[in-house]
Swiss-Prot record:
<keyword id="KW-0067">ATP-binding</keyword>
<dbReference type="Pfam" id="PF03668">
    <property type="entry name" value="RapZ-like_N"/>
</dbReference>
<protein>
    <recommendedName>
        <fullName>Nucleotide-binding protein NE1849</fullName>
    </recommendedName>
</protein>
<keyword id="KW-0547">Nucleotide-binding</keyword>
<feature type="binding site">
    <location>
        <begin position="57"/>
        <end position="60"/>
    </location>
    <ligand>
        <name>GTP</name>
    </ligand>
</feature>
<dbReference type="GO" id="GO:0005525">
    <property type="term" value="F:GTP binding"/>
</dbReference>
<dbReference type="InterPro" id="IPR027417">
    <property type="entry name" value="P-loop_NTPase"/>
</dbReference>
<comment type="function">
    <text>Displays ATPase and GTPase activities.</text>
</comment>
<dbReference type="GO" id="GO:0005524">
    <property type="term" value="F:ATP binding"/>
</dbReference>
<dbReference type="InterPro" id="IPR053930">
    <property type="entry name" value="RapZ-like_N"/>
</dbReference>
<dbReference type="InterPro" id="IPR005337">
    <property type="entry name" value="RapZ-like"/>
</dbReference>
<keyword id="KW-0342">GTP-binding</keyword>
<comment type="similarity">
    <text>Belongs to the RapZ-like family.</text>
</comment>
<dbReference type="Pfam" id="PF22740">
    <property type="entry name" value="PapZ_C"/>
</dbReference>
<feature type="binding site">
    <location>
        <begin position="8"/>
        <end position="15"/>
    </location>
    <ligand>
        <name>ATP</name>
    </ligand>
</feature>
<dbReference type="InterPro" id="IPR053931">
    <property type="entry name" value="RapZ_C"/>
</dbReference>
Amino acid sequence: MQVIIISGLSGSGKSIALKVLEDSGYYCVDNLPASLLVVLINHLQTQQHAYVAVAIDMRSGENITVLPWQLKMIDKSIQIKFIFLEARTETLMQRFSETRRRHPLSDKNITLEEAIRREREALATLTGLGHHIDTSSLRPNVLRAFIKDFIADSRSPSQLTLLFQSFGYKHGIPLDADLVFDIRCLPNPFYDPQLKELTGHDPEVIRFMESQPDASKMLRDISSFLGTWLPAYIRDNRAYLTVAIGCTGGQHRSVYFAEKLALHFHDSAHVLVRHRGLAEYKPHYARR
């Protein structure tokens, strides 16, 4: 039996993630009080459900800090995957404004910003339980695609998933990054009029990057660092490791680096690539 637990901040995309799981054949339970997790799983196991997804957050009004204890009580034969979704405060405020929904912790005595802050503090102990996704810059279709890839990976044999994410510093560092590499010191294709509108996927940009000695050296250095320490993360039983590569806009250099690193480590782990700065990006697994 496999159980995917979804938690995170209100407005971060939990409903979207749960709907994708439901459409993928998971038996889904929304807004479960954390104290009932073990009871629910034991019951569903007797009903022979193979794939279960559960959303647990602040809506139940219960103390969610019992969740880590509940997870320890689950039978070891059951595979547990945990997804924590969050977004920047300004992004969440904009989403609540657009949908005109009420934040579950808001009342007439506190502002929306204060409600978000309180929820973030209450959920802080859960951020390290599993895979952490910052949805601040993710469109709904992009989040759906990522959850689908997460499902595909969860149904494969257990192994570290290594996620390479390109991003632009002008939009902020991804909240879910475990390691961050800043490559803004490298020559920028953006200033070449013939390359400005292209991306790190395009052959012209690839040739430009490959012609830069510093880019090649930095790529080797990052590869060497990850190659040295990746076995330690695997020995630590990490399920996910997110490596963020940042340039100015997240369009050229970081995209090129993320793709190159993904190919380099293709045989060392389940490798997933995500490009936050590309409007039409879809998450994908590296292929040789």
